[in-house]
Swiss-Prot record:
Protein name: Maltose-6'-phosphate glucosidase
Provenance organism: Fusobacterium mortiferum
Keyword DNA damage: no
Subunit details: Homotetramer.
Residues at which Mn(2+) binds: 169, 200
Entry annotation: catalytic residues: 170 (proton donor), 264 (proton acceptor)
Family the entry assigns: Belongs to the glycosyl hydrolase 4 family.
Stated role: Hydrolyzes a wide variety of 6-phospho-alpha-D-glucosides including maltose-6'P, trehalose-6P and the 6'-phosphorylated derivatives of the five linkage-isomeric alpha-D-glucosyl-D-fructoses: trehalulose-6'P, turanose-6'P, maltulose-6'P, leucrose-6'P, and palatinose-6'P. However, sucrose-6P is not a substrate for MalH, and this enzyme also fails to hydrolyze beta-O-linked phosphorylated disaccharides such as cellobiose-6'P and gentobiose-6'P.
Binding site for substrate: 93, 147, 284
Keyword Manganese belongs to the record: yes
Length: 441
């Protein structure tokens, strides 16, 4: 079996050790000869990289390992780029969340004005990675799971339409893991699903078992009472903010009980509730900086200090196994059915053909073949048209350096009550993002 060379772009991410451990756990299915890391923050990456070097030496000494801030070094001789970058890191995420909240609007990483701000920072970073990949390893594929995936995917469609980039998100996978637990199934792969929408903005229209039996009634019954909170599940290890999001799905479901919703729809359908239950001084970004950031860097420090991973609490990122499934589908033409963010092109019959939609695809060595979804109901279509307009205007604003279009994008967001509030938020975001955004005129 061929052995592959992997580059993790965003090597300094706190998700990197979990992803590397997950890759090592799947070597029988996806053999690896080399793992590289790339980041533009040398100091941050070195802390993670030194610990990962020890993990690899212990668990898979045959795999060549390196990390670099030099694009040529990092991107040469690569088969797959796994991209998870956060331009501006968590201090900028904190502003994405707190600036809208100051104006009484949802402050969230990928939804509403915060997601638009993050998108404006991310476009240049992701396009840069694609260009490095195409220059130094022109046959490589990029598996991009950088947020905000919807805006990033639209930017890749507009700016690098022929690139070998697959945009994927783990949120539906996380919810499907919960669905499988609710149903008492071994794995989410025991379900056959049909899902449609935009990224962080979609609905399951059917869930069946492998024998074709309809599982929707049982799921709907559970979600209508408990949301996606799992009975006897590992809920105590889920942060409070996530538990609330999973529970709130029951109210989102009530709007259309024929489908099952993505949890992120709460930000668009219940923005008043979200703002009311937000702490304007301590947001999700603070939770992450005080939690996962300190934990992962602390554990990496211990590994380096002891020159051993013994007693180390870093664990495999199980959810991230979808990245291996995707890489295997390309490498070995497995024809696996996966949710990807792809150009609609008629898959959703009554929706913009150029929209980047999140739908099931059959993935093989030539990339994804989207499955036909058919027609979608007016309610979902209307919501998606409003949201895809936000995403398209944001990308146009970045390309054209247009203040007008970004103001329109924020105004169009279902989370924002008026054009005046949109303008006030935009002006504050411009001030905060001077280092990262193009100049808007």
């Amino acid at each position: 079996m061929k052995q592959f060379s992997i580059l993790i772009a965003g090597g300094g991410s706190t998700f990197t050790p979990g992803i590397i451990l997950m890759l090592l756990d799947n070597l029988d299915k996806f053999p690896i000869r080399q793992i590289k890391m790339f980041d533009n923050d040398a100091e941050r990456q070195a802390k993670i990289g030194e610990a990962c070097a020890i993990l690899l030496k212990e668990k898979a000494p045959q795999i060549k390992f390196s990390y670099s801030t030099n694009p040529e070094e990092a991107f040469t001789d690569i088969d797959f780029v796994m991209a998870h970058i956060r331009v501006g890191k968590y201090p900028m995420r904190e502003l994405d969340e707190k600036i809208p909240l100051r104006h009484g609007v949802v402050g969230q990483e990928t939804c509403g004005p915060g997601g638009i701000a993050y998108g404006m920072r991310s476009i240049g970073g992701v396009i840069g990675l694609i260009d490095y990949m195409e220059k130094y390893s022109p046959n490589a594929w990029m598996l991009n799971y950088s947020n905000p995936a919807a805006i990033v995917a639209e930017a890749t469609r507009r700016l690098r339409p022929n690139s070998k980039v697959l945009n994927i998100c783990d949120m539906p996978i996380g919810i499907e893991v919960r669905m499988a637990e609710i149903l008492g199934l071994e794995s989410r792969k025991d379900m056959d699903i049909m899902y449609y929408g935009l990224n962080h903005f979609g609905w399951w229209k059917s869930v069946r078992d492998k024998q074709g039996n309809d599982l929707m009634p049982k799921l709907r019954e559970h979600v209508s009472q408990y949301g996606y909170v799992v009975p006897k599940g590992d809920n105590q290890h889920t942060e409070a903010s996530w538990n609330d999001t999973f529970a709130k799905a029951k109210d989102v479901l009530a709007l259309d009980p024929t489908t099952l919703p993505n949890t992120y729809l709460k930000y668009y359908l219940f923005p008043d509730y979200v703002v009311e239950h937000s702490n304007k001084e301590y947001t999700r970004a603070n939770e992450v900086m005080d939690g996962r950031e300190k934990f992962v860097f602390g554990e990496c420090e211990k590994v380096v200090k002891n020159q051993s991973s013994e007693g180390c609490a870093l664990h495999i990122d199980e959810h991230a196994s979808y990245i291996v499934d995707l890489a295997r589908a390309i490498a070995f033409n497995t024809k696996e059915k996966m949710l990807l963010i792809v150009e609609n092109n008629g898959a959703i019959v009554n929706f913009d053909s150029t929209a980047m939609v999140e739908i099931p695809c059959i993935v093989g060595s030539n990339g994804p073949e989207p499955l036909v979804v058919g027609r979608i109901p007016q309610f979902q279509k209307g919501m998606m048209e409003q949201q895809v307009t936000v995403e398209k205007l944001t990308v146009e604003a970045w390309i054209e350096g247009s203040y007008q279009k970004l103001w329109q994008a924020i105004t169009m967001s279902k989370t924002v009550p008026s054009a005046k509030v949109a303008k006030d938020i935009l002006d504050d975001l411009i001030e905060a993002n001077k280092e990262y955004w193009p100049v808007l005129k």
